[in-house]
């Protein structure tokens, strides 16, 4: 694989000189400048890179997006697609698929890449598992991804709420395959508690994203630990060898090819089965800047590198996100099911999936994004 040419753009982390503010009230959101401006990680100005043609996103016609949003509001549900301003939201919503975000809309972390609001979360909604299960059943979803904000305020990191959601979905929609995309459950005794709880009702796919290479963690994921995330993935797999494990990384934050390849090797060495690799897009001018746009050919080369390492599936492309076409990723990895939805749109083939990662459309959506957790 040819070593990519990386533009020499200095990234300076500057100290946070914001005065301490009064404690936040539960549920109050900090986003954009309000969120990042109070983070211990601040970024000096760097040149803004022009988005290449392969980063354009198609905005489909029709009212499927609005219909799905209405159903979500009716059941008081949140999708990470909306909260994180994902660039694929129009495509996924128009196909009747979504990644549901449980445990509220406020995260206890201030990751510099993420557009989800920071603050002091409200207590978990005990009715949310039932509302989620009802929506999944009404939509006729055959595959659903459930993720959450970080909940460092909870002793189990929210693991019991995940289990309650899994159990409720299986009760209301027993044919639905369930992938969970979890936080890291970091904290004294928290991983142990979370894994014990998840053992009572494990998902069909367990996903936890390492997000970036370890050298960039202080700037990208303050409050997280690379080895902790790897350990979580390995320990879950050891407890549930029959459940596929999955992780994902973003590119464009200043990583090198050698670092990316080393991270892929680390994931495989920790028994991760599937991996996603996609381009980081800056949600707001206050977030971590994009330092490089990797080309479609480079993503293809990383896909080949990952498959040679022994992953059962590698989704690698500029617009790939952890839960983007997650049903097809799982199907290609050997998890058998009929990946169709009830809203009338045909499932997208894996060939179409790969093609869409390299085709530029005439219109671009708001390309703020998160690879999410």
Swiss-Prot record:
Lineage: Bacteria, Pseudomonadati, Pseudomonadota, Gammaproteobacteria, Lysobacterales
Main location: cytoplasm
Cofactor requirement: [4Fe-4S] cluster
Pathway it works in: Protein modification; protein lipoylation via endogenous pathway; protein N(6)-(lipoyl)lysine from octanoyl-[acyl-carrier-protein]: step 2/2
Residues where [4Fe-4S] cluster 1 binds: 81, 86, 92, 323
Protein name: Lipoyl synthase
Keywords from the named record: 4Fe-4S, Cytoplasm, Iron, Iron-sulfur, Metal-binding, S-adenosyl-L-methionine, Transferase
Catalytic reaction annotation: [[Fe-S] cluster scaffold protein carrying a second [4Fe-4S](2+) cluster] + N(6)-octanoyl-L-lysyl-[protein] + 2 oxidized [2Fe-2S]-[ferredoxin] + 2 S-adenosyl-L-methionine + 4 H(+) = [[Fe-S] cluster scaffold protein] + N(6)-[(R)-dihydrolipoyl]-L-lysyl-[protein] + 4 Fe(3+) + 2 hydrogen sulfide + 2 5'-deoxyadenosine + 2 L-methionine + 2 reduced [2Fe-2S]-[ferredoxin]
CDD domains with a match to the protein in the record: Radical_SAM
Pfam families: LIAS_N (PF16881), Radical_SAM (PF04055)
Region Disordered, residue ranges: 14-36, 346-373
Cofactor note: Binds 2 [4Fe-4S] clusters per subunit. One cluster is coordinated with 3 cysteines and an exchangeable S-adenosyl-L-methionine.
Domain Radical SAM core: 93-312
PANTHER family: LIPOYL SYNTHASE, LIPOYL SYNTHASE, MITOCHONDRIAL
